[in-house]
């Protein structure tokens, strides 16, 4: 399909990517991802519709049918606010990339952090699920250059300024999320040492990540790709 979607282990910017003999599969992946994005998130219109059931509507309006329009207007305000937040965080690009990866590899991770939405391919994270398919643990691997790391993190590494080319070697930082009780807990590590100040927690139903699967198979931690169906 598209070799750059899932590079071989050890690949870098100088690796020569194998070019398939035919572009049919690559075009198919691009077209399918585009059609899925248009269907799921159509431009200039809400991709979901908020509504209330009859009993809740009775409570909100007190049985007055003339107030239904007010309820609908408030719900539309919420819809527009969600759409505005989505556009502000520039989510369409990572969502399109997620769809491409799901088609080819069956797995992709979306993470909503302080800098917006980031996506991670299958070789950048691991996930553990229970037999019911619920996520128990996620670990994300990110690589940074030495000059971009803050001083407190740099002190935890084995970086030596006298090492030849050491300033160009990437440093791996791991972000771990694990479920414990009614909360998700998180912290970061570098070279097996916890980075101070990175600890945090989230409600169990509001984690800042989404480990997506194309086809979920019972008892398996990862999903199956669309291309495996052919």
Where are these regions (language model features)?
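Extended, helix-rich architectural segments
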Residues: 1-169, 178-179
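N-terminal export/ancillary region detector
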Residues: 172-173
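Extended, charged amphipathic alpha-helical segments
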Residues: 183-230
């Amino acid at each position: 399909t598209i070799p750059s979607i899932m590079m071989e282990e050890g690949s870098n910017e100088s690796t020569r990517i194998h070019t398939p003999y035919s572009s049919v599969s690559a075009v198919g992946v691009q077209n399918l991802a585009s059609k899925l994005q248009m269907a799921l998130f159509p431009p200039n219109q809400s991709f979901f519709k908020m509504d209330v059931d009859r009993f809740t509507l009775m409570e909100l309006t007190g049985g007055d049918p003339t107030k239904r329009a007010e309820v609908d207007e408030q719900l539309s305000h919420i819809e527009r606010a969600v759409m505005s937040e989505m556009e502000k965080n520039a989510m369409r690009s990572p969502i399109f990339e997620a769809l491409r990866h799901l088609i080819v590899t069956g797995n992709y991770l979306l993470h909503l952090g302080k800098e917006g939405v980031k996506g991670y391919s299958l070789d950048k994270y691991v996930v553990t699920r229970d037999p019911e398919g619920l996520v128990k643990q996620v670990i994300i691997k990110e690589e940074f250059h030495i000059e971009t790391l803050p001083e407190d993190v740099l002190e935890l590494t084995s970086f030596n300024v006298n090492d030849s080319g050491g300033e160009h070697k990437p440093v791996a930082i791991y972000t771990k999320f694990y479920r414990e009780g009614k909360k998700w807990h998180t912290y970061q590590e570098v070279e097996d040492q916890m980075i101070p100040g990175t600890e945090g927690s989230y409600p169990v139903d509001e984690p800042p990540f989404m480990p997506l699967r194309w086809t979920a198979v019972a008892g398996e931690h990862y999903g199956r790709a669309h291309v495996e169906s052919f």
